[in-house]
Every structure is written in C-alpha cells, then in structure tokens.
C-alpha cells in the first residue's frame, strides 16, 4: 500500500489528520516500533511520549511516520527530516487504523464445512462461515456475516447477531444472546452454569441455573474467559465492553456500556457495574456490590462494598487511591514507627 493511500484512508477515520508531507510516497508493507523500523515500515509516536522516543524520529529507519499534533518539538524536527509523515490529533488511533489497513483480518470462506454438525431448525444468515467440527444446536439463529471457527459449540436456542467473530473451541450455552459485531476469543465460555449450591444436612444441594447470558453489541471476550448464567434471570454485558483473557464473571452480573476488564478479574454473582468502569488486572469484586459509572480500580483491588461513581480505588479492602498511595508510602516505615512507639512506652513506664 502506498503512503498516499494511507493518508487518504486516515482522513476518513477518527484520528484527526492535521497535516502531512508526501515526498517519497513509499510503499508501506508493515508496521514497526520506531527503534525497530526499517525500509517500507510505518511507525508512530504517541502524544506525551518520553524524550528518548521523541529523539528517535531523527534516526529511525521507518519510511513513514505518524506524529502527534500537540508536540511542537516533534513538529519542528519533522520539518527537517526527509521521511514522509502525517501529523494527527490522535496518532495512536491512526496507528490502530493503519494496522487494520495493512493487516486485514483473515476471513474464512463463506459456507459450512462438511464436518460441521448443524441441528434442526437452525437459521443461518447470508455470508456466514462455519468451520470444521463446529456444532450448532437446534433452533439456533446466526446473523449475516458471522464467522464461526473450528470446534465452536453453540448449544440449542442460541441467538447470534450479525458480523460476529467466534474463535476456535469457544462454547456458547443454551439461550445465550449475542448482539452484533462481538468477538469471542478461543476457549471462552458464554453461559456456563453459575456457581450455585445450597448447604443441607446431607451436603450441598445444586441450584439449577436456568437463566441466560446476554452480550450487547461490540462486546469482546478474551481467551479462556467465562461468563456464567444465573439460576433465573440474566447476566448482561453492556455494549462495547472489552474483557481480557482469563476473566471470570459470575451469575447475574450486569455491566454498563464501555467497560474494560484486564486479565484475572473476578466478579462475584449479582454485582452491578456502571458505564465506563475500568478494572485492572486481578481486581476482585464481592457479590451484589454496586459500582458507579466511571470507577477505576487499580490492580489487585478487592472491592467488598459499594463504590460511588467517578472514584479511583486501590487496595484491599478498596479505599480511595490517593489514600492508598499515602498508606503504601508509610508501610515500609512501620518497623521504625513501631520501634519508636515501644521506646515511648518504656520511657512512660519508668
């Protein structure tokens, strides 16, 4: 792809092209970091990049650069170098869009592989691809343009919207509903049984889990993640929510739109998550907790009670992040503080 083609495509995107220079109009074949780029590569510098990366634009071997509009230092250097460039309001978004141009998703050929098993009364939309050894249960519906890779299992009565991408060996249980443009990565399980057992004098009594899971439009679920169905009712994942690998979402959880959850997050049953909530790696949330819109929880935070909207929390149990930082700074001083207190006690007892 020639550089001018990338320029024209980015003009139509979301990155905000401010200016560009086309001198050599190189053919761009791949993308790379500034330090590793070579001929026919395109690279980028993000807003607020550290000085050591900013200085690399003078020595990088990339054939083209995506540069931030808010950095006057970079813009001055760009005017002096011979490399073609684009100046943008959001260079990271531009780089993401450029990767999409250069590395289009591998699209399976339309149609149903001969080894796939298709149940009764299954409705399959136009342009659907179903890979080898996939299993589609009775009364399931699959929307137009959806791609189902090898080994996927859709139980009966599943509803899949249009343009979804379901990767190999994922399992979607009975009654689950996916909106449009969802991505389910390999080995994820949607709608598995919630963890429901009742203690009795004779041991544990299993609580049947007959509810369903609903994923709204543009939800992405990482490899090995699980979203459980409840005993009754629904587990709901809001539109445009992004879930990393190895995340566990319990029965009856609801999330708002635009949430993000990093690896090994665990959310217990019945928790209610607002819009735009960000959960860093290994965050744990107790059952039935309510978390307001825009909450951010740093890594390993343990949330055991409700959190107000817009709060940034850390630690276990979760406390405001600034307080946690102060506590953490003092933690290593505790031996000295304890020693001082003992000395005061001895003086007092004399």
UniProtKB/Swiss-Prot annotation:
Pathway(s) served = Bacterial outer membrane biogenesis; LPS lipid A biosynthesis
Q: What is its EC number?
A: 2.3.1.191
The reaction(s) annotated as catalysed by this protein in its Swiss-Prot or TrEMBL entry are:
a UDP-3-O-[(3R)-3-hydroxyacyl]-alpha-D-glucosamine + a (3R)-hydroxyacyl-[ACP] = a UDP-2-N,3-O-bis[(3R)-3-hydroxyacyl]-alpha-D-glucosamine + holo-[ACP] + H(+)
A biological process (GO) of this protein is: lipid A biosynthetic process
Which keywords does this Swiss-Prot/TrEMBL entry list? Acyltransferase, Lipid A biosynthesis, Lipid biosynthesis, Lipid metabolism, Repeat, Transferase
Q: Which residues form a coiled coil?
A: none
> What Pfam families does the entry give?
Hexapep (PF00132), LpxD (PF04613)
Catalytic residues in the record:
251 (proton acceptor)
GO CC, sorted alphabetically, is: carboxysome; membrane
Per its UniProt entry, what is the enzyme's top EC class, as one word? transferase
Q: Name one GO molecular function term.
A: structural constituent of carboxysome shell
HAMAP family tied to this protein: LpxD
What is the purpose of this protein?
Catalyzes the N-acylation of UDP-3-O-acylglucosamine using 3-hydroxyacyl-ACP as the acyl donor. Is involved in the biosynthesis of lipid A, a phosphorylated glycolipid that anchors the lipopolysaccharide to the outer membrane of the cell.
- Recorded family membership: Belongs to the transferase hexapeptide repeat family. LpxD subfamily.
NCBIfam families according to UniProt: lipid_A_lpxD, PRK00892.1
- Subunit annotation: Homotrimer.
Stated name of the protein: UDP-3-O-acylglucosamine N-acyltransferase
Organism lineage reads as: Bacteria, Bacillati, Cyanobacteriota, Cyanophyceae, Synechococcales
